[in-house]
Amino acid sequence: MAARTRLSLLLPQNLPRFGHLKLVHTEAVAKEPAYPPIVPSLTAKSNSARRRQIEEQVKKISASPVEEKLSLITRIQRLKFVVYPQTFARNADKWYQHLTKTAYVPGLPEKSAQDAKTVGDDAFADIRSLVTRVILHEHLQTRKRKPFLYRHQEQLVGPFLKNLVIALTHSLAKYNPVLQRSSLDISPQVNFYWRRGKRIIPKGHRRGRPEPIRFQIDDNPHSQIRITEQLPQFAPLEASYSAEVPEITLAPNLMPLFRRQYENNIFTGAKLPDPACYGHTQFHLVPDRFHRDRMSREQQSDQVEVFLRANGLASLFAWTGAQAMYQGFWNHEDVTRPFVSQAVITDGHFFSFFCYQLNTVALSVETDANNPRKNILWGTESLRLYESVEDKEVVGLNDAVIKLLVQFLMNQP
């Protein structure tokens, strides 16, 4: 039987020390995975599967051409809130600012007034006489019968605005070459569809699931001018970071807005291959129910400008947003440059002027979380073009309104 020996725990004196040894850190060799990564199922009924379905759909839309992209975005039809540009809801402009993430700035942008080319005194005198002739023509030389019920603006003021727009566009084309290559649409149709906010489905077989809140604008301006080149921005994108947008926590049906289910549309007034794909200026007529005197008698004078602001905001947001969609931008691919448009709203006597700059179309809950951009609307108060027509003369013709019309139409890239 072998004898057991006791080993000493102390190091022997003759062993070398560790001080002269250097430890070298070597990187571990990264091994390629032998199997593909584990991803959630596309068919399972789980939150992870739903997230993967959304990611795959976003990749598919982003890789598609513009025409197919618009079809994929508007393909699924659900109940959506229909936003009417001309609404008599109280304080509708605040609601529309929240739904479109738009900040309102009183007055017109300074850059627009500085960059706009001006016409000479002789040319302005010709334009002033032209506006006078158009007004006198509608009052003295046009045979007018009594209009149908609730069609006074369409049948009496509509022809005046049409003649005014055509005459001014034709006269200023010699000073603004962009108007020579422009396209003038009469009674066009403009549509825009977007998502903003989310809700929990209260009932039905989809009860308890989160759902984005959908909105649709179907607008019918009196006329609009489209051009082949994009108008310059009124302000840099970074200028919108500090703008304030009203925050409304109430549901849209309390405005009130009503939900309908029909085809989702995104349309600028022209088809996708049209070279005049950028907006210049829209012209709108107020409805027959809009009476300044009646609203004053009902102690709603403060809602006159609210109505006009809401109209300008919704119409320009729909038109400018559709232009951005035509260029391939959408909710998950935000705009890389601002899109701008202008609008004029009138009842034949009073004119309101608005400028809109679209800085973002990422309005859904997922894309708006860390998005400091905001859209901006500039607008003026109502300005009266003339007082009346007496003895074949226009009384009180306002040169400031004519100058603003010229300034809008002289805007060019």
Each PLM stretch: what is its role?
Residues 2-304, 379-413:
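Charge-rich, low-complexity intrinsically disordered linkers/tails
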Residues 296-365:
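Internal, well-ordered interaction modules that form the hydrophobic cores of assembly/scaffold domains
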Residues 352-389:
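Polybasic, proline/glycine-rich intrinsically disordered low-complexity segments
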